[in-house]
Amino acid sequence: MVELDSGWAVDQAIVREEEKVVVVRFGRPAHPDCLRMDAVLSKAAPRLRLYACIYTVDLDAVPDFNDMYELHDTDVATMFFFRNRHIQVDVGTGNNNKIDWAMDDTQDFVDIAEVVYRGARKGKGLVVAPSTDYARRRY
């Protein structure tokens, strides 16, 4: 995983990637939820290397996107982009813009990333996660 340290670097990562999904984890690196999500992402990265690039962004060091993506009251949020387009993911929580909790299961994340890739390649801006019981497991 590559850490992006400026708004410009985040924009360039999203704009320049033509073939893969860009996964951006916004968060506060010292927070326990962020650490859990980073562990899932680092385990998933080798399995996703052919169709996804994973980046991390410190919300406090790079506040440029806090308003745009409504990241004010979250400690971790994961978003997906493809060819400079934000891909929304319906995981059953009502908020399709981002996954705003730490996932515990690497396979769940891999499954979501695969669905995002397949849907984005077909031109879809909103994809439905393979399982929508994430909201139940979250609470």
Report the location of each language-model feature:
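N-terminal "domain-start" segment that seeds a small globular fold
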Residues: 1-13
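Thiol-based oxidoreductase modules, predominantly thioredoxin-like and allied folds used
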Residues: 3-6, 26-28, 42-66, 73-75
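Conserved beta-strand elements of beta-rich interaction domains across eukaryotes
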Residues: 9, 28-31, 59-62, 83-86, ...
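Acidic, Ser/Thr-rich intrinsically disordered and amphipathic helical segments
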Residues: 9, 36-43, 64, 77, ...
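Short amphipathic alpha-helices and their capping/turn residues within compact interaction modules
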Residues: 9, 15-19, 42, 46-53, ...
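Short active-site neighborhood of thiol/selenol oxidoreductases, capturing the structured segment around
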Residues: 17-29
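Intrinsically disordered, low-complexity regions enriched in proline, serine, glycine
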Residues: 22-25, 34-36, 51-57, 65-68, ...
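Non-catalytic, surface beta->alpha helical segment in thiol-disulfide oxidoreductase systems
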Residues: 73-74, 80-131
